């Protein structure tokens, strides 16, 4: 579903979920891919769609604008070494190529701490004027990972999203691109709500998009 995707911006931040769940659309697929070698993991259809989505977004950024790509699981970091907290000017295609090449080196793993991604967004100077969030469901942890793996109930995951949202920089639209995960029925409505509250947009694309 597409509700007026808000493109444009002079400081565009793309946040990419790189947790283990981005390997599959069902828990069974995630478990199967997690047992595979890394070179197979990065060819998982859902992760390839994620990479294609980021590449498509970069084609919408105007020359001269600034951008940044952060990948996040239990931590958040830029895909261009040494550029954390700063912006990259879109002078020519090589700027995007470097950021995308860094993203392609990432192998999805670990849990999802959305609060880390939103804290990174708030720490950027100057702050973003447009954020794109690519994820597949509600976060599985808050600011710190649990000492031992544990099942996380839906209400706790919703609370992790509320905690993360409180860290967002003020008055910045969040455009959510959701690649839904089986067994997380609340994700769509809660991320739609986040997008609407921030005057962003929400998209749950078909598997062959973009």
Regions found by a protein language model. Name each.
Residues 1-7, 18-22, 26-36, 51, 87-128, 132, 139, 189-192, ...:
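Von Willebrand factor
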Residues 18-22, 73-78, 108-111, 127, ...:
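Solvent-exposed loop/turn segments at secondary-structure junctions
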Residues 137-197, 203-205:
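VWA/integrin I-like adhesion module and closely mimicked acidic/polar interface patches used
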């Amino acid at each position: 579903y597409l509700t007026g995707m808000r493109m444009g911006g002079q400081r565009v931040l793309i946040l990419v979920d790189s947790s283990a769940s981005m390997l599959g659309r069902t828990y069974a697929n995630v478990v199967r891919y997690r047992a595979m070698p890394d070179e197979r993991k990065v060819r998982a259809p859902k992760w390839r769609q994620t990479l294609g989505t980021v590449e498509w977004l970069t084609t919408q950024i105007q020359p001269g604008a600034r951008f940044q790509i952060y990948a996040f699981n239990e931590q958040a970091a830029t895909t261009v070494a040494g550029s954390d907290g700063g912006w990259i000017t879109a002078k020519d295609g090589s700027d995007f190529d470097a950021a995308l090449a860094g993203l392609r080196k990432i192998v999805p793993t670990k849990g999802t701490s959305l609060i880390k991604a939103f804290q990174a967004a708030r720490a950027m100077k100057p702050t973003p004027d447009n954020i794109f969030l690519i994820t597949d469901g509600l976060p599985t942890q808050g600011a710190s990972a649990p000492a031992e793996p544990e099942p996380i109930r839906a209400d706790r995951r919703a609370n992790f999203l509320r905690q993360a949202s409180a860290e967002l920089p003020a008055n910045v639209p969040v455009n959510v691109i959701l690649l839904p995960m089986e067994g997380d029925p609340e994700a769509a409505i809660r991320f739609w709500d986040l997008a609407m509250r921030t005057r962003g947009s929400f998209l749950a694309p078909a598997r062959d998009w973009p």
